[in-house]
Amino acid sequence: MEQEQAEIFALKALAFLAQNEDKMNIFANLSGLGTGDILQRAGEPELLAGVVDFFLSDEELLADFCNANDIHPDTPARMRQALPGGDLPHWT
């Protein structure tokens, strides 16, 4: 996946996350940013990588997002590979 596609995907995920105040607050706490800061920095690839990581760490949130947007459950992990830090080698 190209980075631009992955960034668009992550922006959709962030918009979905912003609709859930509890989950958004958890993400804000984990990131060390306020919700306003997160939204201001939404175009930064590193932040978007963190958004996708957050979805990948929360199975219920991931399933809700995928179901609401008709996205195959494997897509977020593939998109993550195109964002900063996602191209790490697999040693197995």
Whereabouts are the PLM-identified features?
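Metal- and O2-centered redox machinery and metal/ROS homeostasis
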Residues: M1-T92
